[in-house]
């Protein structure tokens, strides 16, 4: 399929122009079916060598939120505990083990063999890409998102990923946003401030 057709203005608004970072959510649950549908969109986003290093934990239960709570900064705790879903966006630093399946037309695994430190940058970069896809896919499905980094990564890793090569990156609260929790819309940089032609 060639990407030849632009999305209409309403779709672009939903994804970008009128979408907001949410700080409060309606008391409406998000089903596991919707979260699975969300991942089924996210997985198609491009990553280097189709490495797909992101790993997602959808924290929806009271037990899961209790496990997450000690890692949250004071300013993020209340809204995170109240959100229907908090996604831990993480990455697997041993992602290369799956490359024979994910990238079969080249020996991509050999590119990343060796000390784990040599894979950290790629895992972080491509996992971050997948986290961004998650936010846009959520918006496309009618969900609202509140991404944040105000938490203790080491505590999250100990609570959710102990004994594994998986490292947390950032959190995303998901649900159906409550406009009462929005801050006034902040400005963005103009093209000339952020970009140039060469």
UniProtKB/Swiss-Prot annotation:
**What span is annotated as the signal peptide, if there is one?**
none
One molecular function GO term is: oxidoreductase activity
* Pfam families, per the entry: Nitroreductase
Q: Does the keyword NADP apply?
A: yes
Keyword tRNA processing in annotation: no
**What is the enzyme's main class?**
oxidoreductase
Q: What is its EC number?
A: 1.-.-.-
Q: Which InterPro entries match?
A: Nitroreductase, Nitroreductase-like, Nitroreductase_HadB/RutE, RutE-like
Q: Which UniProt keywords apply?
A: Flavoprotein, FMN, NAD, NADP, Oxidoreductase
Q: Which cofactor does it need?
A: FMN
Q: Which family does it belong to?
A: Belongs to the nitroreductase family. HadB/RutE subfamily.
HAMAP family the UniProt entry points to: Oxidoreductase_RutE_HadB (MF_01204)
Q: What is this protein called?
A: Putative NADH dehydrogenase/NAD(P)H nitroreductase XAC0554
Provide the species name. Answer: Xanthomonas axonopodis pv. citri (strain 306)
